[in-house]
């Protein structure tokens, strides 16, 4: 009694299946990381956890939600009286999956991944209406050198071959997030 269960809500079954399919098709550039963890990956896990929370009358806490589907599920669960708290992170409020494209995409690999503009807006709406209770940092700082350390070398260019499945996930920026968050809050 009195305990609160916290969840990083991503379906490993969906993520593993999607990742393997993409790699089998030779799709390994940074932008495919998001496709390996589609919105359904988070939505399925949130739905499953909310189902048990409601069934067992156990409060739950969701860490760093990133999808419009998950926010809507939490919103509806709260309306039904389910005891649920949820958060998002500054990067899901400020950045989109466009950052995963191109050479610098490796710098924006995180779990859950960055999402679409529609998802980004849904995070702000969730904060505004109280569906989301907190904004956290989930600060995971890894230098580009660390992220690239296990990538294969390209013999022709002496560069690294992109492969979204290899680097550690995480994004720095704790210092900038508070200021960016205040700008967003002031713009409504």
Regions found by a protein language model. Give the residues of each.
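His/Asp/Glu-enriched, well-ordered alpha-helical/loop segment
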Residues: 28-57, 107, 143-188
């Amino acid at each position: 009694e009195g305990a609160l269960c916290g969840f990083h809500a991503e379906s490993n079954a969906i993520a593993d299946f999607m990742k393997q399919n993409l790699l089998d098709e030779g799709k390994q550039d940074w932008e495919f990381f998001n496709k390996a963890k589609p919105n359904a990956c988070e939505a399925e896990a949130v739905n499953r956890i909310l189902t048990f929370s409601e069934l067992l009358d156990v409060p739950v806490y969701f860490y760093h939600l990133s999808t419009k589907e998950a926010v809507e599920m939490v919103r509806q669960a709260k309306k039904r009286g389910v005891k649920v708290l949820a958060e998002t992170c500054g990067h899901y409020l400020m950045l989109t999956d466009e950052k995963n494209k191109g050479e610098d995409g490796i710098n924006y690999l995180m779990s859950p991944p960055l999402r679409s503009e529609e998802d980004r807006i849904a995070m702000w709406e969730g904060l505004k209406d109280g569906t989301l209770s907190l904004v956290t940092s989930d600060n995971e700082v890894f230098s580009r050198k660390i992220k690239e350390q296990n990538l294969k070398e390209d013999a022709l260019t002496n560069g690294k071959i992109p492969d979204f499945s290899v680097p550690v996930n995480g994004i720095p920026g704790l210092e900038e997030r508070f200021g960016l968050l205040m700008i967003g809050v002031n713009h409504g």
